[in-house]
């Protein structure tokens, strides 16, 4: 099973954190990431989960469109920056198909650390805006397959 953890792209500043849209820079980041993943065939999923925050929803939507893979978007509770990672980790452990999760820091780093190292703190990963991390599950555990940061795209 493959799991893709993707941090939302760069967003505009604003007073209402939940409503902050992607910036032009962020939109460019997502287009480039989607292009790389499509070109290298490094991404396979039918579903992209995202937090209820606008910047994550927009990142997920642009990613799905750019990948041209027909992935469905699904807003999922438990993916905001301050949410505990145990519930979402348990939910991911029950999955039998690849899924992508578009979320936020420090949540994604804590989630990746919990899945790979068995504990969320201190985080073992740093997810920059519009970075992607692929984890593969085998033999009851998770392992890092690859990581793409915005500087590489």
Where are these regions (language model features)?
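Hydrophobic/basic alpha-helical segments enriched in Actinobacteria
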Residues: 43, 47, 67-70, 88, ...
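Generic recognition of short, well-ordered alpha-helical interface segments
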Residues: 55-58, 106, 139
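Residue-level signal for well-ordered alpha-helical positions
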Residues: 62, 114-115, 138
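Mid-chain, well-packed structural core segment of small domains
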Residues: 75-110
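Non-DNA-binding regulatory cores of transcription-related proteins
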Residues: 98-100, 105-131
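Domain-level recognition of soluble alpha/beta enzyme cores
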Residues: 119-153
